[in-house]
């Protein structure tokens, strides 16, 4: 007699292109059977892959299943249902009349994201340019609509191509909400806002910059010498650590912690994310409290920084950043996002005053040749440089890639939108 052997070629025989199929057919190899399957296409290539994610066929269930990003979070909406036919038979295998029950297949839903295609492509290209210019270990950039909380763009490097999966092994973590960093001086924005809210920030008041002793530790301004006796406004433009510690004292250490909590640090943003981390706000030792004033010791996610910044940019109303606009199937709209406002620790007046100071940080005389000072377009914000946390061994990274340099800001100043 003869025997028939069936062999599954595994992934090597999956996801064939039309041209590959035609080539196999023309080769006239025997024993090859082709099966139609569903497949998700990603025609935009490297386009917010960590937010969009990707899906692939589950060989056991024969269903396309989301593996990352929106594809994974909203898999149940996207997947649909094969449908089925059920019936009863008697003991002789005869179909029992009127016992057939048919469940029609359900088409998967559609998800609309908040991403702006033009801004997203620009952001992707900007990170590519930055990579070539500075060769950083990693980078990220996000753009949020200040009036709604919609994430208009989100990119990071290293990245992966969702179509080919090239680069995926080294870059599956979503920097927006799964990567905690010590933010450095960009965090000073929130201490400044708290000091203005409490009425202790007087822009023309003077103090002695340079250094300050906390217990057995001496903390210096970033240039190690300071700038002598300067105003609070000048200290902010120079990004003085001594100024921020002074403002923390004037607000009150524990009250400042309350402001950090209300800005949303140390807890998840509550966005529709998968595996969001909350960061940490250590507050046991005096040195931890003081270094938090200028963005060291504390760890945050970019999502938290963006959320807190909306309260400053949006007249004291804090918005939750989100990237899913709506979900709908062929029958109805299943979900439609709307701006979610949370209680902000600052007033509209404080928001306006904080923006005035941040405008000076970029455009003021003491700021010097700030790279964010543009002739044709006026923006405001705060730069930051922080030591990179070594999450595996504790302490800070040594050698190459010791520092995280960043900027958080908004534009245009005349009508704040992004």
Predicted regions mapped to residue ranges:
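Amphipathic, well-packed alpha-helical segments that form the structural scaffold of globular domains
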Residues: 79-82, 93, 112, 124-128, ...
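Beta-lactam-recognizing serine transpeptidase/beta-lactamase-like catalytic domain environment
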Residues: 90-99, 145-184, 190-415
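Conserved, well-ordered alpha-helix/loop/beta-strand core segments that scaffold catalytic motifs
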Residues: 96-139
């Amino acid at each position: 007699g003869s025997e028939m052997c069936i062999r599954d070629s595994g992934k090597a025989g999956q996801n064939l292109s039309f041209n590959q199929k035609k080539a196999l057919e023309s080769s006239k190899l025997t024993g090859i059977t082709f099966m139609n399957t569903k497949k998700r296409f990603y025609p935009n290539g490297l386009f917010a892959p960590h937010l969009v994610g990707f899906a692939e066929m589950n060989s056991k269930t024969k269903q396309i299943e989301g593996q990352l990003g929106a594809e994974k979070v909203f898999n149940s909406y996207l997947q649909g249902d094969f449908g089925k036919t059920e019936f009863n038979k008697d003991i002789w295998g005869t179909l029992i009349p009127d016992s057939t029950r048919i469940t029609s297949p359900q088409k998967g839903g559609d998800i609309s994201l908040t991403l702006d295609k033009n801004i997203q492509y620009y952001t992707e290209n900007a990170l590519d340019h930055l990579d070539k210019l500075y060769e950083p270990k990693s980078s990220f950039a996000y753009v949020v609509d200040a009036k709604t909380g919609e994430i208009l763009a989100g990119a990071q490097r290293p990245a992966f191509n969702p179509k080919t999966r090239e680069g995926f092994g080294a870059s599956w973590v979503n920097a927006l909400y799964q990567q905690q960093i010590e933010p450095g001086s960009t965090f000073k924005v929130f201490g400044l806002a708290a000091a203005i809210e409490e009425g202790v920030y007087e822009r023309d008041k003077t103090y002695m910059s340079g250094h300050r002793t906390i217990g057995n530790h001496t903390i210096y301004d970033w240039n190690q010498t300071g700038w002598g006796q300067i105003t609070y406004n000048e200290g902010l433009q120079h990004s003085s650590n001594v100024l921020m510690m002074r403002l923390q004292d004037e607000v009150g250490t524990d009250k400042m912690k309350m402001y950090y909590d209300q800005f949303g640090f140390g807890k998840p943003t509550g966005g529709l994310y998968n595996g969001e981390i909350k960061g940490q706000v250590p507050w046991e030792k005096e040195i931890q409290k003081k270094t938090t004033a200028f963005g060291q010791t504390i760890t945050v996610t970019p999502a938290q920084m963006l959320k807190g910044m909306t309260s400053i940019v949006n007249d004291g109303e804090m918005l939750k950043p989100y990237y899913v606009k709506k979900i709908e199937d062929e029958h109805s709209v299943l979900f439609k996002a709307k701006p979610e406002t949370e209680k902000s620790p600052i007033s509209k007046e404080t928001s306006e005053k904080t923006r005035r100071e941040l405008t000076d940080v970029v455009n003021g005389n003491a700021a010097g040749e700030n790279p964010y000072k543009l002739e044709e377009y006026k923006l405001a914000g705060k730069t930051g440089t922080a030591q990179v946390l070594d999450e595996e061994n504790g302490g800070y990274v040594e050698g190459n890639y010791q520092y995280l340099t960043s900027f958080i800001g908004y534009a245009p100043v005349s009508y704040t939108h992004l």
